[in-house]
């Protein structure tokens, strides 16, 4: 099924939020067809309220939801997730993801969005993560060094469908190569 123009901001740390929020709001104001889903690394009422106020002050409608079914039933421009355990499902509903942690402790799981064929954007703290390097090398995602690169990267993906499709295919290719390698290992083990 055709996915909507939705950006998932997943495993968000405060450092990610602080780095990209103004760029994100600027982009959303200029591109009214884009919706976002925001999933904090550790969802809590204080952070949800803080985020909600920022978006509402910028005249963006906000819903805070605690289940996958509610994500599908609201029409707000901004959906804030107030639960854990549904990220893997959310990736199948979006065209692009920003994966948090890259401005603090290290970027989070990049294979989950790749499995869903979703290109990723992440911060500069990724070098100790082999899959992040692979995603960049294969063109399945981009890294930003600071917030100013975020809006430009969103424009590059959402406003040029070819880039999005190409990166999405690269993400799927990475997963397929991992599956192929796993099969070879299992077959090799089975011989012994």
Features from the language model and the residues they span:
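Nucleotide-activated sugar donor-binding and catalytic core shared by glycosyltransferases
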Residues: 1-192
């Amino acid at each position: 099924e055709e996915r909507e123009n939705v950006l998932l901001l997943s495993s968000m740390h405060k450092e990610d939020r602080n780095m990209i929020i103004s760029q994100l709001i600027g982009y959303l104001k200029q591109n009214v067809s884009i919706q976002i889903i925001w999933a904090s690394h550790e969802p809590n009422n204080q952070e949800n309220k803080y985020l909600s106020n920022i978006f509402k002050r910028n005249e963006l409608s906000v819903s805070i939801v605690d289940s996958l079914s509610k994500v599908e039933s609201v029409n707000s421009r901004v959906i804030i997730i107030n639960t854990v355990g549904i990220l893997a499902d959310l990736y199948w509903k979006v065209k692009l993801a920003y994966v948090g942690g890259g401005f603090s402790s290290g970027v989070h799981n990049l294979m989950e969005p790749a499995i869903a064929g979703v290109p990723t954007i992440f911060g500069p703290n990724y070098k100790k993560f082999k899959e992040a390097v692979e995603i960049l090398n294969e063109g399945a995602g981009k890294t930003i060094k600071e917030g100013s690169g975020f809006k430009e990267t969103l424009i590059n993906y959402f406003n040029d469908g070819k880039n999005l499709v190409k990166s999405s295919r690269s993400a799927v290719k990475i997963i397929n190569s991992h599956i192929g390698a796993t099969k070879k290992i299992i077959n090799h083990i089975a011989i012994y």
